[in-house]
UniProtKB/Swiss-Prot annotation:
Source organism of this protein record: Staphylococcus aureus (strain NCTC 8325 / PS 47)
This protein's name: Alanine dehydrogenase 2
Pathway field: Amino-acid degradation; L-alanine degradation via dehydrogenase pathway; NH(3) and pyruvate from L-alanine: step 1/1
Active site feature: H95
Gene of this entry: ald2
Similarity comment: Belongs to the AlaDH/PNT family.
MF-aspect GO terms: alanine dehydrogenase activity
Length: 372
């Protein structure tokens, strides 16, 4: 199979679809890998590293897309849509439930798109989303602490406090991978941490994991309102695989927060859980203030720590990339149920129910689509 690794063009997206070691594994399996010039430089992988791994370095973006399978990190931007072609396998994060124009382009061009974030194991875990959820979760507490500083627009709160002064209050909505990792760092900074989740069993697990050092609260509108308004930092970490994130924090709740408090919306790439995160921000201009509250809504948080993120992502995605390349997509989907759940569009059809419902499009199961 011929595989392309393009350079990411999203604002300050410094990750790359495969590291040189991943490229080497594909080449050793008999595949041809094209890597766009400087695709890995943001993660401190140079062209010579890829060349030594067996890749062909190409300067033309169009050439790196003219392949059987493209492996990326983030969803394609509009300038990349013209490279879509029938039968192209696109393997990347997509978050299509918040990307109607991209969804339509994939359908129109009959692209076979596989979203990292919807590959799902029998225990409902998300193996290709998990590494970046860990990174984004850990970053969210660090970023929140930074923007609570007065010079960054915050109220001037030190999360850990000092003797005689209360700790900062951190509320995390969602106790999955991102929320759990946010709690780890917030606790490490010395904050007073509360996690809200809808699953009582998960709350019990979190209580055991943290040895009672975090407050675990059932997530419902009343409790969300109560804890949001008294928090210095609120982190939104709710995920419904493939679907838009629920708007759990209303504008009225935000209005009740203290001036200079901070919200971090990790779920912004799926639409966000805060009513007031009505726009996606970038690493160049990461925040805006609304109702006196600092809003951070960067959709590619792990792009700020690309070396760690690329290596972690490569560890997770490479086995699936090898499966697609070695077996071909049809056999790979048939032999691996978790991978088949990653299929979002197939030759003009939407094969993810959450995406179909988001845009009122016709849905076909993977099994139905593969028979066409």
């Amino acid at each position: 199979m011929k595989i392309g690794i393009p350079r990411e063009i999203k604002n300050n997206e410094n990750r790359v679809g495969l590291s040189p070691s991943g490229v080497h594994a594909l080449v050793e399996s008999g595949h041809t890998v094209l890597v766009e010039t400087n695709a890995g430089s943001g993660s401190f992988f140079e062209d010579v590293d890829y060349k030594e791994a067996g890749a062909e370095i190409v300067a033309e973006q169009a050439k790196v897309w003219d392949v059987d399978m493209v492996i990326k990190v983030k969803e394609p931007l509009e300038s990349e849509y013209p490279y879509f072609k029938e039968g192209l396998v696109l393997f990347t994060y997509l978050h299509l439930a918040n990307e109607e124009k991209l969804t339509q382009a994939l359908i129109d061009r009959k692209v076979i798109s596989i979203a990292y974030e919807t590959v799902q194991l029998p225990d409902r875990s998300l193996p290709l989303l998990s590494p970046m959820s860990e990174v984004a979760g850990r970053m969210s507490a660090q970023v929140g602490a930074e923007f609570l500083q007065k010079l960054n627009g915050g109220m001037g709160i030190l999360l850990g406090g000092v003797p005689g002064v209360p700790k900062g209050k951190v509320t995390i909505i969602g106790g999955g991978q991102a929320g759990t990792n946010a709690a780890k760092i917030a606790l490490g900074l010395g904050a007073d941490v509360t996690i809200l989740d809808v699953n009582p069993k998960r709350l019990q697990q979190l209580d055991d994991l943290f040895g009672g050092r975090v407050h675990t609260i059932m997530s419902n509108p009343l409790n969300i309102e109560l804890y949001v308004k008294q928090s210095d930092l609120v982190i939104g970490a709710v995920l419904i695989p493939g679907a838009k994130a629920p708007r759990l924090v209303t504008e009225d709740m935000i209005k009740q927060m203290k001036n200079g408090s901070v919200i971090i919306d990790i779920a912004i790439d799926q639409g966000g859980i805060f009513e007031t995160t009505d726009k996606i921000t970038t690493h160049d201009d990461p925040t805006y203030i609304k109702h006196g509250v600092v809003h951070y809504a960067v959709a590619n948080m792990p792009g700020a720590v690309p070396r760690t993120s690329t290596l972690a992502l490569n560890n997770a995605t490479l086995p699936y990339a090898l499966m697609l390349a070695n077996k071909g997509y049809r056999e790979a989907f048939k032999s691996n149920q978790p991978l088949s759940l990653g299929l979002n569009t197939y030759k003009g059809h939407v094969t993810n129910k959450g995406v179909a419902e988001a845009f009122e499009m016709e849905y076909k199961s993977v099994e139905e689509a593969l028979q066409l």
